[in-house]
């Protein structure tokens, strides 16, 4: 498999966290595995050798595990990371990743995958849950605007860091498969 290195930003390279987000079945895991760094995602916590079936209860436990593991790796190990998950909004897991990256001095690259036009979810997510995910999913511009506008949750210093060190890229799933396949 052809591994990609994380992009560098600026003269002095900061450690990076790559967030790969998108709807279930969009190819997040496939793309995340292509980066040459530690790969963490919710599926790793939930599966433990079984076929992964999404459920709100399992998802809650997995999100907490992911946040704890990412924070530990950022603070203790200071290594490049890639994390894959749905992460529809700025104020959930993605917001905590931003806050931890700010505290640890990380550069953040967010890749948002579009919905795969030819594939059903590989995780047997119910259609009503997929509809809810679609409704919740913020665009990259909406995430950026929400973070920069929220003066109560985010300090001015954080918002300056966010503007300089968080980078967004929208990728159609089949494009990533062709480019990286």
Please name every model-derived segment.
Residues 2-7, 17, 21, 34, ...:
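Conserved GTP-binding G-domain of TRAFAC-class P-loop NTPases and closely related GTPase folds
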Residues 8-14, 74:
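Phosphate-binding P-loop
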Residues 13-18, 78-79:
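Pre-Walker A (Motif I) flank of P-loop NTPase domains
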Residues 19, 40, 82-83:
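Conserved Rossmann-like nucleotide-binding pocket used by diverse enzymes
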Residues 24:
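Conserved SAM/SAH-binding loop
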Residues 27:
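Conserved glycine(s) of the Walker
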Residues 30-77, 118-120:
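Conserved substrate/cofactor phosphate-moiety recognition/catalytic segment
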Residues 57-113:
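Glycine-rich phosphate-binding loop used to anchor ATP phosphates in small-molecule kinases
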